[in-house]
Amino acid sequence: MALRFPRFSQGLAQDPTTRRIWFGIATAHDFESHDDITEERLYQNIFASHFGQLAIIFLWTSGNLFHVAWQGNFEAWVQDPLHVRPIAHAIWDPHFGQPAVEAFTRGGALGPVNIAYSGVYQWWYTIGLRTNGDLYTGALFLLFLSAISLIAGWLHLQPKWKPSVSWFKNAESRLNHHLSGLFGVSSLAWTGHLVHVAIPASRGESVRWNNFLDVLPHPQGLGPLFTGQWNLYAQNPDSNNHLFGTSEGAGTAILTLLGGFHPQTQSLWLTDMAHHHLAIAFIFLVAGHMYRTNFGIGHSIKDLLEAHIPPGGRLGRGHKGLYDTINNSLHFQLGLALASLGVITSLVAQHMYALPAYAFIAQDFTTQAALYTHHQYIAGFIMTGAFAHGAIFFIRDYNPEQNEDNVLARMLDHKEAIISHLSWASLFLGFHTLGLYVHNDVMLAFGTPEKQILIEPIFAQWIQSAHGKTSYGFDVLLSSTSGPAFNAGRSIWLPGWLNAVNENSNSLFLTIGPGDFLVHHAIALGLHTTTLILVKGALDARGSKLMPDKKDFGYSFPCDGPGRGGTCDISAWDAFYLAVFWMLNTIGWVTFYWHWKHITLWQGNVSQFNESSTYLMGWLRDYLWLNSSQLINGYNPFGMNSLSVWAWMFLFGHLVWATGFMFLISWRGYWQELIETLAWAHERTPLANLIRWRDKPVALSIVQARLVGLAHFSVGYIFTYAAFLIASTSGKFG
């Protein structure tokens, strides 16, 4: 018999139903469950696949550069970044009639094009790229890296070049390599690029390979470095009337601590960013020499963890046993990595708008909105994934004997306390926040808006004041004009910071009031509830009061029959599934809040947000309904316009989202009956019954149907909001 899909599971390959296909796809990446897998092959397969992942990333970024160089308007945009719309790529569509061709021909292009809302133009401009030739060079280089990655992946699957398990489990060497070799060296290299190429470009000087060795990045060269007069590198920074990309108002400093923003570009000073990357490089280069490898000096991570025993013995055996538990569990390591990456991605979303690093990106409002929303959604998916793999760790890898009475075991021992506290916090936040919103709704409905309960966020305002925001009238720390911190800030460090915090032309420490207080607590409710579901799913993954032996059922069992009071919806997978809905819900509130507050700021009618955000009807009417009018206007009696594609995507997104419920709200038996009826009709229809199938069609399993429903719900939800966000922002601000 010919080998059927999936080759990695003989049991599945012999399944006579369509379950073979779906389960095959579902377990294709679960290498641990494949036939004939060994620990060594598991590690080697994952290692090799990382190179494939890198190859795809390099190919994708190369494609971005290539298409902008080929079909974009980068050189025209460089001449006037604030008024030329950046083109991502051309649109070739044989269905376009004349109205469509006219609607999408913009940005100085000859035919229909897509506008770039990704910020790549601003990024490339900031780092010193100026011509299409530069972009082509970058595209070719990344293509080369992509090829190298593919070759490396193939190479590490050859018997001679396959690393051993001991190599993968050498935590100290890996840490040293990643800290020094990857973070440290790459940060140092980036500092070098900023100092040698980007900063000269911002001052109107082109540095390329042909003159790279002739142009001094600083008039005094390396002299100050070797004589210890490092402060010379900070002297004579760019002036406040510096025109970015020209020598007008330019200085000679390369490493500064100015603080605040470049007045023209509204982005962080390049010389501050070079300084930042140099400091990061230094820290990581040091950190990467801390762990003991072949030379017998430095820390052993196992020794560090074993030494972590809390005083007095009241917290058990501390971190004993953790080293082997983590080092032998890929799921634990992946969980830690995803948790860190998720937090970092969310921080990127926050910092990209509050402290914009790229020239002129702060004035490109649609790009700002798109980047914030994009990074928050990505963060949500990554963070939920962290808990999914945490749960799989407890089911597949956790050994109670190895972890007796250490922090991990003690966390499991008092999981009821953890879960009930989270539950209490979620209930408190939910009822109080909804209570305030609904009370305010009723007051507005009965025409007595003055009876709303409006709470000033005084603690948050105090924190903003401590960082230098003066408008609230708190006389504290950096907002206290007589204090030593304030005086030092004027001269020694970050003199531009206080101006930036108190200017209203950026997003640093936005003024907050009762509407912000309420939505902050709505978001806190979402975060705590999502966390509650995820934490409960992971801590109960091996067993709970109702079902003590979950471990034997695995990660994604649907139910254990009607016994024990009915055990549906209690697998670790079910917790993850439910949590993703809450995650999407929460990020909805986060992005609604960010977008509405910023739209009113950019339009100069901030009172609309302040007055309408204190009750639910305000959100529905003055944010969602009012801003979706552009979408519904993509086609009108006068023909179509450039928003029509978003109007279509808005409708299509709703369709995909609604389709999700077909899978989420139905019983498996209904589908099986439907399939049997369709198969019966097929077999009795002339001509059609000439086509047969090998696999008996069966309905999706409960877990699979939920996954398909969740996928449609998520994709449709994000498509719908993306169309709304981009159309409503670009429709207002161009």
UniProtKB/Swiss-Prot annotation:
Coiled coil: none annotated. [4Fe-4S] cluster binds at residues 559, 568. P700 is a chlorophyll a/chlorophyll a' dimer, A0 is one or more chlorophyll a, A1 is one or both phylloquinones and FX is a shared 4Fe-4S iron-sulfur center. It is found in: Plastid, Chloroplast thylakoid membrane. SUPFAM superfamilies: Photosystem I subunits PsaA/PsaB. GO terms for biological process: photosynthesis. Its main location: plastid. Keywords: 4Fe-4S, Chlorophyll, Chloroplast, Chromophore, Electron transport, Iron, Iron-sulfur, Magnesium, Membrane, Metal-binding, Oxidoreductase, Photosynthesis, Photosystem I, Plastid, Thylakoid, Transmembrane, Transmembrane helix, Transport. It catalyses: reduced [plastocyanin] + hnu + oxidized [2Fe-2S]-[ferredoxin] = oxidized [plastocyanin] + reduced [2Fe-2S]-[ferredoxin]. GO terms for molecular function: 4 iron, 4 sulfur cluster binding; chlorophyll binding; electron transfer activity; magnesium ion binding; oxidoreductase activity. It is a multi-pass membrane protein. The chain crosses the membrane at residues 46-69, 135-158, 175-199, 273-291, 330-353, 369-395, 417-439, 517-535, 575-596, 643-665, 707-727. Chlorophyll a B3 binds at residues 662, 670. The keyword Translocase does not apply. Phylloquinone binds at residue 671. The keyword Heme does not apply. GO terms for cellular component: chloroplast thylakoid membrane; photosystem I. Chlorophyll a B1 binds at residue 654. InterPro entries: PSI_PsaA/B (IPR001280), PSI_PsaA/B_CS (IPR020586), PSI_PsaA/B_sf (IPR036408), PSI_PsaB (IPR006244). It is an enzyme of class 1 (oxidoreductase). Its EC number is 1.97.1.12. PsaA and PsaB bind P700, the primary electron donor of photosystem I (PSI), as well as the electron acceptors A0, A1 and FX. PSI is a plastocyanin-ferredoxin oxidoreductase, converting photonic excitation into a charge separation, which transfers an electron from the donor P700 chlorophyll pair to the spectroscopically characterized acceptors A0, A1, FX, FA and FB in turn. Oxidized P700 is reduced on the lumenal side of the thylakoid membrane by plastocyanin. PANTHER family: OUTER MEMBRANE PROTEIN, OMPA-RELATED, PHOTOSYSTEM I P700 CHLOROPHYLL A APOPROTEIN A1-RELATED. Belongs to the PsaA/PsaB family. The PsaA/B heterodimer binds the P700 chlorophyll special pair and subsequent electron acceptors. PSI consists of a core antenna complex that captures photons, and an electron transfer chain that converts photonic excitation into a charge separation. The eukaryotic PSI reaction center is composed of at least 11 subunits. This is Photosystem I P700 chlorophyll a apoprotein A2.
